[in-house]
Amino acid sequence: MIQIYDEFFPRELQEEILNKLMEPHWHLRGGNDHNLFWHYDHLDQQEYFNEFLYKKICAKLDIKFSGISRIYANGQTACQGGTPHQDNDADMTFLYYPSLHWQPVMGGHLMFLDNDGFEDRIVQHKANRSVLFPGKLWHYASAPSRFYVGLRISLAYKLWL
């Protein structure tokens, strides 16, 4: 079951998260060899993300997870699309979009696929939105529009139930 939460964090916290994610720790190594995108690894080693923010996420979702598999961020610039994949390293995937402003025409939406590989559901990328879904679902992020000049960020938590 895919769950969507809008206006997930208060504006002040949203800005704080975005500022932390804009620190210069990005590497062009996400995705695969044929389809690279920006990646910010090892956020699970930062107390801000693995303690402070994790507790806020659990409280907001009203779920007690048994643990964290990984925390990282993906970043996409114009025309950088994701590759369809499953998150088999945890039961649930929590994504958070810390963007302060986003318009649907900018693209970068979260695409879920059916068993035949066709798009089954689209969750629009939206500022301060979060999405919780079973990691076994096939999904990918579509590319931001060629007119988008920023970094589309998704903060990812891989969680055990």
Where is each model-derived feature located?
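Non-heme Fe(II)/2-oxoglutarate
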Residues: 1-69, 76
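Catalytic core of non-heme Fe(II) oxygenases with the double-stranded beta-helix
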Residues: 51, 55-161
